[in-house]
Every structure is written in structure tokens, then in C-alpha cells.
């Protein structure tokens, strides 16, 4: 398969809106997709970690994919998170995603088992047999697997492997992967502040959790970096950096804080689902204060 030149830009790692009773809030999800499209994103990743896939049944994930395809109507790229612990489970999910009509899928290595190098390579080659374009996701803290350039190049030998998302905080290692495979794979960073460093090296986009809070700003940041507009890049990156470093200080899982921020900003992120617990008043108060300081919300 040829390099996916249409996979580029800002792809929000979408939250999945839930109602207070835990059910999927389809109306809010559709509203979010429309909001992101209006803010200039080029694609979305649904039912990834930010989308709380680990709390959803396979049927629920399939429903989210169907709604995403319907709501986007071909206007943006839709990537379905089809990660699972076992190969059989991931194969079944990826086949379902293909049948639904998504543009591609995003997959972590098998999680929680610290898979060996050859097992990870075989895992992705096996899943490539489904025939759906795959974005390989390197997230060492979640999987215990840190892919280096040699491993990614080996995985990329399968034609259906078309993209790579990396959250490696070691810039040299991230750069080595980009240099090695950017002629074959559309490389995305999952670390928003790193975009200004990896895009000039050959990466093509950002899969962004923070975009749930400020997609328009993230798009402006990406466009400024790509076009060489250093003044706008500085202004927009400053906001992103501050959000990126502030959210972990709240002491809650990122997705809890992101949904709380969305609610404060009037963005339809919905409720969090168990095992996560809703943001408490102390966290919400700190969030409100920071969003005001960053001039992202009014004082009322």
C-alpha cells in the first residue's frame, strides 16, 4: 500500500461522551464531531485510550464506529481504536471496524503481558491480514513495550501498516524512527508539545488528547509549524505546553481532567465511566482557575 499522504494534520483522540447512567451519548458524540470539523481537524481517533475503550464492550465500540462514520460523512478520516490484549480479540474487533467502514484502525501492542519483540512484530503482521489500514501505536507506559526504529521498520514490511503514532519522550529515539520509516508510514506524535520538534523531521501530524479541550488552537499550532510562522507557533504552543504540564498536577487520570475541562468550556464531552470516578469539586476549582488564567473561559 502506498504512503497515506491523506493522513496528516490534527486528529483529536476523541473522548467518548457517556450519560450519567453510563450509556453512550450519541447526540453529544455527533455534536463533538461537528465541532471538531468546524475547528479544522483532518481526522479523529475514536475508542482509543482517551475514548475509554477499556470500559466498553465490543458491541459498544462498534456502535461508536458506526456513528462516527455516519456523522463524519467522509469529510474527515475516521480511525477506530481496536486494541485488545489477545490476538483473536483484536482480529475480531478489526474485522468489525473494517465492515463498519472506518478508514483505518489504531492498535497498541498486546497490553499487560510485556510481549517479546518477535511476538509484537508477529502480532501486527497478523492483524495486517484483515486488510484495514493500521496505525501502530507506541505507548510504553501502557504496554511495557517500547518500539525502536528496527522494530518499527520490521512491522512496516506489511503493506496494511500505513501509520505510526509515538509517545516516546526521548526525542533522539523518536527522530530515528521518523527518519527510518517516514517514506513508508505517516508518522504522528501523541505528545502535543513535541509537534514543533518532530514535524520538521518528517512527522505529518498529531493525535491529540488536548484537542478535546482546544482543537482550534491545536490546528493553528500545527499549521503555524508547517508553514514556518514562528510567531503564531510560539503563541499557540505556549498555551498547549501550559495545559499539557498542568493537567497531570491535578492528580486524576488525564481523561477525567479532560472531560471536566470540556464541561467547564461548554464542550459536549459527557460523563466519565467506571472504573474512573468523576472529578471532585477541588479538582474542578483548580481547573476553572487555570482555564481563566489561560483566558480560555470567562470569569462568570
Curated annotation (Swiss-Prot):
Catalytic site positions: 49, 137, 165
MF terms (GO), sorted A to Z: 4-hydroxy-tetrahydrodipicolinate synthase activity
Annotated site (Involved in proton transfer during cleavage): 137
GO cellular component, one term: cytoplasm
Source domain of life: Bacteria
Span of the signal peptide: none
Localization in the cell: Cytoplasm
InterPro entries: Aldolase_TIM (IPR013785), DapA-like (IPR002220), Schiff_base-form_aldolases_AS (IPR020625)
Predominant localisation class: cytoplasm
EC number: 4.-.-.-
BP GO terms, sorted: small molecule metabolic process
Entries under Pfam families matching the protein: DHDPS (PF00701)
Expression induction: Expressed in vegetatively growing cells and in nodules.
Gene3D superfamilies linked to this entry: Aldolase class I
Key words, A-Z: Cytoplasm, Lyase, Plasmid, Schiff base
Subunit structure: Homotetramer.
Family: Belongs to the DapA family.
Record's function text: Upon expression in E.coli complements a dapA deletion mutation, but this may not be its physiological function.
Protein name: Uncharacterized DapA-like lyase
Native species: Rhizobium meliloti (Ensifer meliloti)
Lineage summary: Bacteria, Pseudomonadati, Pseudomonadota, Alphaproteobacteria, Hyphomicrobiales
Amino acid at each position: 500500500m502506498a504512503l497515506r499522504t491523506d493522513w496528516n494534520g490534527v486528529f483529536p483522540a476523541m473522548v467518548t461522551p457517556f450519560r450519567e447512567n453510563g450509556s453512550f451519548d450519541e447526540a453529544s458524540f455527533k455534536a463533538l464531531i461537528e465541532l471538531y470539523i468546524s475547528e479544522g481537524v483532518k481526522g479523529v481517533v475514536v475508542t482509543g485510550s482517551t475514548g475509554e475503550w477499556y470500559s466498553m464492550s465490543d458491541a459498544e465500540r462498534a456502535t461508536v464506529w458506526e456513528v462516527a462514520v455516519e456523522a463524519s460523512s467522509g469529510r474527515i478520516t475516521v480511525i477506530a481504536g481496536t486494541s485488545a490484549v489477545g490476538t483473536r480479540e483484536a482480529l475480531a474487533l478489526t474485522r468489525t471496524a473494517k465492515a463498519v467502514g472506518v478508514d483505518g484502525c489504531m492498535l497498541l501492542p498486546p497490553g499487560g503481558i510485556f510481549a517479546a519483540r518477535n511476538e509484537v512484530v508477529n502480532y501486527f503482521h497478523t492483524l495486517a491480514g484483515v486488510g484495514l489500514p493500521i496505525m501502530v501505536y507506541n505507548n510504553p507506559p501502557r504496554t511495557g513495550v517500547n518500539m525502536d526504529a528496527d522494530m518499527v521498520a520490521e512491522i512496516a514490511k506489511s503493506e496494511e501498516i500505513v501509520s505510526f503514532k509515538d509517545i516516546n519522550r526521548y526525542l533522539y529515539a523518536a527522530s530515528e524512527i521518523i527518519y527510518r520509516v517516514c517514506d513508508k508510514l505517516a508518522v504522528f506524535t501523541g505528545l502535543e508539545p513535541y509537534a514543533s520538534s518532530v514535524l520538521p523531521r518528517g512527522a505529518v501530524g498529531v493525535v491529540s488528547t488536548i484537542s478535546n479541550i482546544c482543537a482550534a488552537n491545536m490546528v493553528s499550532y500545527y499549521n503555524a509549524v508547517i508553514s514556518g510562522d514562528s510567531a503564531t507557533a510560539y503563541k499557540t504552543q505556549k498555551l498547549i505546553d501550559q495545559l499539557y504540564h498542568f493537567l497531570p498536577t491535578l492528580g486524576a487520570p488525564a481523561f477525567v481532567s479532560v472531560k471536566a475541562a470540556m464541561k467547564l468550556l461548554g464542550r459536549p464531552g459527557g460523563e466519565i465511566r467506571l472504573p474512573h470516578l468523576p472529578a471532585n469539586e477541588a479538582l474542578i476549582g483548580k481547573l476553572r482557575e487555570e482555564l481563566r488564567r489561560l483566558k480560555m473561559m470567562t470569569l462568570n
